[in-house]
Amino acid sequence: MTELHHLTVTAAQAALAAGDITAVELTEACLARINATEPTIRAFLHLTPDAALAAARAADERRQQGRSLGPLDGIPIAIKDVICTDGVPTTAGSRILAGFRPPYNATVIERLVAAGAVLVGKLNCDEFAMGSSTENSAYQITTNPWDPTRVPGGSSGGSAAAVAAGQVPATLGTDTGGSIRQPAALCGISGLKPTYGRVSRYGLIAYGSSLDQIGPMAWTVADLAVLLNVIAGHDPRDGTSAPIDTPDYTTALTGDIRGLRIGIPREYFVEGMEPGVESATRTAIEVLRDLGAILVDVSLPHTRYALPTYYIIAPAEASANLARFDGVRYGFRAEGETMWEQIEQTRGQGFGPEVRRRIMLGTYALSAGYYDAYYRRAQQVRTLIKRDFEQVFTQVDLLAAPTSPTVAFPIGQKINDPLAMYLSDVCTLPINLAGVPALVVPCGFSEGLPVGLQLIGRPFDEATLLRVGDAYQRLTEWHTQRPRLVV
């Protein structure tokens, strides 16, 4: 059998059902792997080993009694630290939330617990999910398991690195502008950004409220389908949660994609894309043709405006959302002679430079005299970007494109160049602006580092994305590759 810490969710599920392993053995293997690799990877901000082992023992007891809760019962999972967990530190990677323990669980956590998942801890991320490298965390820099001198991507870098390093078989991340998909690509795993509204945001610490979405990260598309079955669905506590039925996503994994029309958007093969990335992506697209799909060249003409549009709308929403953090009721608090001085010092010291930068950008865009020139105009362009997708989906069933223009870059290379960092999400931002779903699967290597193929779908049609991604993984072996970590 594969080493326990390298099992996929579906493989672990089968081994548990067959009695080949116990949930306690699987959890202990993951905890041992975490202890061995954390000095190098630094994916976790907080571990809950005692609670995890207690949950694993409960899962084993249920299984012995014939009361298993389903495919996630006894499976270790870790959570990005922007998702609230009752009584467990939740910092959003920020000093301003140091020591904060939420008094409730996010809806996705409630659903995972109800499904028997074993939660082992909270994962590092860029502060308030603002970043593309996980270098913006106030606590530590997570490294890429394929090359620890390089970034894992961001902002869900801890979530991607934890899977790639074999610390846990699956994680939850969040995606506001590519924060599930880009790190999944850079770490050689699979990741899904669901349609906006498919997964509840209740209990998610907000960055961009019209853009944020929680999603699963794991080795295989089959694993993602199992996780999405659990976390998706309407939640009356989230006003943006879509009141529509959720299918059984595992039934979509038929392996047959014959006749599907897949669009290849020319605008996503951007100038400056590394040749190895483009080559791996185009080779992967040809595999889809070999599987019987029909490839169609398409255009999304307003893609070139996505980057400036995003960096007006997202900071504007962040400016409003982060106004609540003042040190008065919870988290970090600085000293000051007056209330206003205390708030100013708390926010100045509690927020890192990238968060402060985006708050200032957003406040400027929303200010009197600039609202119409920037924010309102950005919303108008966002509508044009949405219409591009609506129009192209009358011609094709889904799109296939690169995820990132580069492979994982060296730690420190872009952290002092915000524009260069922002450009790393040029292939992912438009999807968030349109609110449509997107899936990333590993599709090869360039200079020894992973490359990811991005599949983009119609709103609420995650099933087709999963069907195509699963068919691709049945014919290829990129998702079976594991980094050679020296521990």
Swiss-Prot record:
GO MF annotation terms: ATP binding; glutaminyl-tRNA synthase (glutamine-hydrolyzing) activity
Family of the protein in this entry: Belongs to the amidase family. GatA subfamily.
Matches recorded under Pfam families: Amidase
Keyword Ligase: yes
Enzyme Commission identifier(s): 6.3.5.7
GO BP: any one term: translation
Protein name according to UniProt: Glutamyl-tRNA(Gln) amidotransferase subunit A
InterPro entries: Amidase, Amidase_CS, Amidase_dom, AS_sf, GatA
Keyword vocabulary terms for this entry: ATP-binding, Ligase, Nucleotide-binding, Protein biosynthesis
Highest classification ranks of the organism: Bacteria, Bacillati, Chloroflexota, Chloroflexia, Chloroflexales
Gene responsible for this protein: gatA
Catalytic activity: L-glutamyl-tRNA(Gln) + L-glutamine + ATP + H2O = L-glutaminyl-tRNA(Gln) + L-glutamate + ADP + phosphate + H(+)
Organism: Chloroflexus aurantiacus (strain ATCC 29366 / DSM 635 / J-10-fl)
Job of this protein: Allows the formation of correctly charged Gln-tRNA(Gln) through the transamidation of misacylated Glu-tRNA(Gln) in organisms which lack glutaminyl-tRNA synthetase. The reaction takes place in the presence of glutamine and ATP through an activated gamma-phospho-Glu-tRNA(Gln).
GO cellular component: glutamyl-tRNA(Gln) amidotransferase complex
